[in-house]
Each structure stands twice: as structure tokens, then as C-alpha cells.
Amino acid sequence: RADEFLAAVLEDLAETQTDGGRIAVHGELSPIEVSARDATTLGILVGELVTNALKYAFPDARSGTITVTLAPDDEDVPMLRVKDDGVGMREGDDATESGLGSVIVKQLSGQFGGEPHYAPADGGGLEVRIRLPELGRTRTTTKDDIL
């Protein structure tokens, strides 16, 4: 299940990358059945988003919180949200531009039929929302899936 796998990913990130607990990482994860392949891809996606938040949202030893939510939306489509209460994006910045992290997030999201949307979070910080309509659906491997 996605929730069990992501809980382990978040625990690992919290233990190894949060600068001694200065930044808290929380998960609000619904049980969604997924294949091992989808769980792995989702774990890489979440890892990239959380790592980006750790890298950019909390400069100058600022403390804060990152919350990862995976739950069905109103149409029962899995929705991934990664929200931080950090400094947010500077005016004129575009998280979707060209950084390697953004490219990775876009590519991994696309594997689930999704696209990342970046917006200011309520109360400050940044929230990334990705609707994942293909998560948990059985897919056949195509030549495009093979590196």
C-alpha cells in the first residue's frame, strides 16, 4: 500500500535530512493499493518534493514543517500534496521552469497522468498539488517505460 511505503520514506527523510529535527516532516496518508513499481515511483516523487522543500523553504537555520498528504479528492482520484510553512517562492520565481528537480517531478507525475501545480500555501510557504489519476491502476509496460 502507498501509505505504508510513503510512511517509511518520510521517516527516513526525517531521520537523515531534517538537520536534527529543526524541520518536522508529517504524513497524512490514506491507504491506497498500488503495485510495487508504482510505490517506488511515488516514493521517488515524494522524496524529490520533500528534498526540494528542505533545500529551499528553510534558509538560515529556520525551523518549520513539511506535510505530505495522499488522499482521494472529491472525484475519488488520488491527490498528492506537499506543503511547507517556509519562506515560499519569491515574486517572479517559477518552480516549473527548468531546474532538474522540477523536471524530475514533472516526469514522475506524468507517469501517473498528473502534472504538478505550485501555489502559495495558506499561512505562508509553498504547496505542490499533483492529481494522480493513474495511481493504483494496473498498467502494462510499454517501450516508453523502459530506459
Name these PLM-found stretches.
Residues 74-103:
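Glycine-rich/acidic phosphate-handling loop/turn and adjacent ATP-lid/helix
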Residues 130-136, 143:
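C-terminal beta-strand of the catalytic ATP-binding
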